[in-house]
């Protein structure tokens, strides 16, 4: 939990999920302060759009202007809602939209936290291009190290003339004026053939490893079990390649695709529809914070390639939460399978949570682990 006085409000903010007290990470950064410093309240006219507001620092500060918070993270939405409540601000003061929704027309101010991937930034800038005007004030911010020549060129290409500020507290801003430059259309998804399957995998802008199969998933797919039945989960599904493989290998099973990214869940749905349409009735698609709110003792197996970062920050909090949720939602003797980088030492974490852990396969970079839910039903 951290305190910030940004000139608009004095706020107490926390990350979601919360980090431990030993290795605390802040819920805001200098770029948030720097962005807010640029705004004279008298100049805010028309809708306020805030893109990629990780934990609500900008949305909370500008809540009286009824901003729209736009992004591709359900965790960020939950974190923003939690911080609104914690600071006594009505949740209804902020309207939440995912990045693929239609944006409000003629915004007065657009504040952008530059996302980690250029693909998501381009998708968002193209969406903004449809609604901004020459009078819209467009400001983006990030750590100085995360703003590159390619970032500036993208703003120029999609929206118009772009300048940058000096660094302040290691943060930097981008100012952009819309001039409606000529721009060729771009497809909504990036597609590629998945080797040895005949499948075409479709990826929205913010999907992990959208340009090809990541090496961890490739290794995982080589060791997925067969002949499972009941309900099984692709947790943190991304584009759904693990779930697709599970559907193909386990014709008696139902697969639940879960991710906190709406773009990921939509990519998974699209990939089942186009590659295994006959299996679509055996699928469920869920935008969620891991398995929050899912009833206990529901699943026979959970499969997970857990992230070890949240936006630009390195953290194992999300993976830790996924493992705990998996244990709660597995049936007795249900199994959790994960693939992870060897250096993350998830073996001992799983053993602490489940009381057991076995190594299924390993190579020079990755390890596949299995933990079994034991004990009596509680």
Swiss-Prot record:
Q: Where, per UniProt, does this protein localize?
A: Cytoplasm
Q: Which reaction does it catalyse?
A: guanosine(1835) in 23S rRNA + S-adenosyl-L-methionine = N(2)-methylguanosine(1835) in 23S rRNA + S-adenosyl-L-homocysteine + H(+)
Q: What is its EC number?
A: 2.1.1.174
What keywords would UniProt list here? Cytoplasm, Methyltransferase, rRNA processing, S-adenosyl-L-methionine, Transferase
One cellular component (GO) term of this entry: cytoplasm
- Coarsely, its chief localization is cytoplasm
The record's listing under Gene3D superfamilies reads: Vaccinia Virus protein VP39 (3.40.50.150)
Molecular-function GO terms, alphabetical? 23S rRNA (guanine(1835)-N(2))-methyltransferase activity; nucleic acid binding
Please give the function described in this protein's UniProt entry.
Specifically methylates the guanine in position 1835 (m2G1835) of 23S rRNA.
Q: What is this protein called?
A: Ribosomal RNA large subunit methyltransferase G
Species:
Salmonella agona (strain SL483)
